[in-house]
Amino acid sequence: MNNFPWITSIVMLPILAGLLIPFIPDENGKNVRWYALGIGLLDFLLISYIFGYKYNIQDTSLQLIDDYEWISSINFHWRLGIDGLSIPLILLTGFITTLAMLGAWPIQKNAKLFYFLMLAMYSGQLGVFASQDLLLFFLMWELELIPIYILLIIWGGKKRLYAATKFILYTALGSIFILIAAFGMAFYGENMSFDMQILGEKEYPINLEILFYICFLIAYAVKLPAFPVHTWLPDTHGEAHYSTCMLLAGILLKMGGYALIRINMNMLPNAHIYFAPYLAIIGVINIIYAALTSFAQRNIKRKIAYSSISHMGFVLIGISSFTDIGLSGAMLQMVSHGLIGASLFFLAGTTYDRTRTLILEDMGGIAKYMPKIFAMFTTCSLASLALPGMSGFVAELMVFLGFANSNAYSIEFRGIITFLEAIGIIVTPIYLLSMLRQVFYGSENLKLLKVNNLIDASAREIFIISCLLVPVIGIGIYPRILTQIYDLKTNAIIEHLEIIRSNSQIM
């Protein structure tokens, strides 16, 4: 345990600082914007300091542990810590949240409430990635749901009530299964505990372990999202403000993938061996179905939302591959998509600010009026379709090769999955390039040009996209800069699974 609670500090700073927002004198939201941005940046700098000076990249064990007893009767602890699985996503959370606050600069309606909710989400998402107590993990998982619901209700589009209700129903109902499984695992055996390390060391009857696995899988599949519990995402993205979309695409979806690795894969390995082939099948369905469905979307944000569902399918396939390179690719895909997805939704929002429409047919021919936005949108779309030299290409290639070379499956099964993956990789450029054509090329909408002032990107907007694209290109050129952070941890998980699989009769 640490002398100074480093991880508690980064988790609690945003929400505690947010509680001071009502006392800030402000009329037009200017002071609140700068205050929230300063807190977000301060927390991100603190995260960066911890990673640079306090975290040992060569140590696969849990580090910088904060452990305080909370409710002794059920052995519930405030237990936080970081390792190779959590630190990349904690860095991603700090980075994207800070940029999302800068992206929300034009918001003036209820600015104090808006930025408080952003800071509360910040704490909740950091808490999910840092929690090492399963009940605390559940509380943090729930903490970020309420801010998103309110952000949708107040700052959403015309169908915001429907989208917010659907979001809360899907995610809250899914979360119930986390609570059921958490108490089931904690109460099993002689020593009651929610400590993830202790729970992972328990030996459960295989039928009970499978039951726990299914409960967790339902909740995480909703958050990822995975087919068929994905339908909340396009509706939510379609109605949410684009700064909220940046957090949804950049961080929220990654919570599902992270939890599958941290809990299902790491703590319930026998059940994971049984379910892995089904995860691969669901992953392929995600890739193909969402890519094809994206073609039919007329709303630009819904189209990008379906592309997110498609890209998260690669995470499922990487998790199910039983290979070092496959799991490493899944982690890389989560970080890569977080950056690219946030950039695409931000650009969709800036385009809406100028055209006042999200319908693709109502746009067209605006490239010459907004050349900077056009250039940035094109670059981000190329990154999303996994252009070589971008992070998405490396991530998808690693997942593809990892599953193709897995010795856990028959050659026929591997062949079918990799073939369908390849189809998805081919289809993705078609709908993304089609989106670019509809928005920026073709005949001009004279009514659109007459009503709206199509000014080009501001310095603030260029700065945000540049910040998101620099790591995308950097990781694409030299992926080791990211993979070295978590490779030892993911390799240890795969080695543990291989030992269990070699002694198991499940597969």
Swiss-Prot record:
Subcellular location per the Swiss-Prot or TrEMBL entry: Plastid, Chloroplast thylakoid membrane
EC number: 7.1.1.-
Listed transmembrane segments: 4-24, 34-54, 87-107, 111-131, 134-154, 167-187, 210-230, 241-261, 273-293, 312-332, 333-353, 383-403, 416-436, 462-482
Enzyme category, top tier: translocase
One Pfam short name: Proton_antipo_M
UniProt xrefs under PANTHER family: NAD(P)H-QUINONE OXIDOREDUCTASE CHAIN 4, CHLOROPLASTIC (PTHR43507:SF21), NADH-UBIQUINONE OXIDOREDUCTASE CHAIN 4 (PTHR43507)
Entry's family note: Belongs to the complex I subunit 4 family.
Protein name per Swiss-Prot or TrEMBL: NAD(P)H-quinone oxidoreductase chain 4, chloroplastic
Annotated organism of origin: Mesostigma viride
UniProt lineage: Eukaryota, Viridiplantae, Streptophyta, Mesostigmatophyceae, Mesostigmatales
